[in-house]
Amino acid sequence: MTDSVVVRVKPGSHKGPLVEVGPNGELIIYVREPAIDGKANDAVTRLLAAHLQLPKSRVKLVSGATSRFKRFRLSR
């Protein structure tokens, strides 16, 4: 079974690492890593996997690699 989730990312945040639910029900993920060389994407993938209690290998970034809005595919 696969699902997808769209998240809003706040890279370089002093508030992170943190996952919040925004006012419209969207996930907002704060990470300390900068948006350079995929560091923030890796941190978001790890944090999302931990938050959803899934292995990192089951969380794949499918779109939004250079955007603050990212879509992940979740395999259960």
Swiss-Prot record:
Q: Which InterPro entries does the record match to this protein?
A: DUF167, YggU-like_sf
- Pfam families according to UniProt: DUF167 (PF02594)
Q: Which SMART domains match?
A: DUF167
**What are the GO cellular component annotations?**
cytoplasm
Q: Which ranges does the record mark as transmembrane?
A: none
HAMAP family, sorted: UPF0235
Concerning its family, UniProt says: Belongs to the UPF0235 family.
What name does the UniProt record give this protein? Answer: UPF0235 protein MRA_1997
What species was this sequence derived from? Mycobacterium tuberculosis (strain ATCC 25177 / H37Ra)
